Amino acid sequence: MKNRNINNHDNWETPAYIYDELNKEFNFDFDPCPICFDEITPDKDGLLIEWGQRNFVNPPYSRKLKEAFVKKAIEESKKGKLCVCLLPVSTSTILFHDYILPNAYDIRFLRGRVKFIGYNTFGEKVDNKAGMHDSMVVIFK
């Protein structure tokens, strides 16, 4: 399977200051959306495999993948698993009103914009200085 993220700029890393703070609180044991520039095989595809008990989820933000990972997080939470999702704030969407609001245990809106880490056209690691959008942490359990 081709890497579904590499060509549409979905490979942005979570800054350590956000992950570390959340990990202190939740003690994650799995990340279904790690940065991956290689081929995503079925045994590594976060949409196909079983998740851990305490999951950190910063999904690709393209619409279809974001929706798929939110729905998978809800599905996993119904099995008694914790899923902490870092998502763009988009409160007018069907995803927010029909999936996130009715299923979220908690929603935390972050102050300021997150400066995600990615790679420029020269392959150099950079952050997006201004942040692209507001962010929220959505907890499903």
What do these predicted regions represent?
Residues M1-K141:
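Class I S-adenosyl-L-methionine-dependent methyltransferase catalytic core
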